[in-house]
Amino acid sequence: MIRGRMLAIAILAAAAAAGITALIVMNPVPPIDVMVERDVQATNWGPLALAFPGFSWIGDAKGAVLDVLVFIAVLIWNRGAWVLAVAGFMTGAWYVLLSHLINRQRPTTALVLQVTEHPVASSFPSGHTIFIATVSTLLMLCLGHRYMPRWALPIGWAAVAVIVFDGAISRIYTGAHWPTDVLASLLITAAWISFILSIRWISDRAFAPKQADRSHARLAS
């Protein structure tokens, strides 16, 4: 069975990501990217900027270690959500595929105000953005919905939104990515996770009440 609303969100997000991808293939450096990047870099982000070095640091193998730690946490505290966690982390496969298919040059100081990071891979999409959005969302879906009281869920999702926004802005501020790289990455993540949630067999297991988990455990024993 399929959750129609989540599938519709997945289709819309995927279509938007495809549109941005087509745009940058036809015009790798659209003027809107340069304008937005310069505006972001000229802005004083205050306390949000304190986390920028952390978002830069989390790349490479350190991200894989965090993925493993999150998966272990899901196995311990919400075993029924392990399929959701594994499927969710497949956003990394989308990054690998698209970064090999689309070789986009990264921002340079000839066009933007600063470039403080110099990754060698394709600028499109933003692997950091996909990673941050995926991990934050999966933590909320797999553990937040299990243990947080209902009144606190909006607060939890607001925290996720702030973290994802801050991480996205950091990739533009450092000059590591163009704004369209970051926007497409958010849409790719939203499309994939929404698609997974649309599959009831996966989402029902992840959001099953604790009592149902104990019943399954007794049956298994």
Model-predicted regions and their roles:
Residues 7-10, 56-78, 81-86, 133-139, 143, 154-161, ...:
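Hydrophobic alpha-helical transmembrane segments
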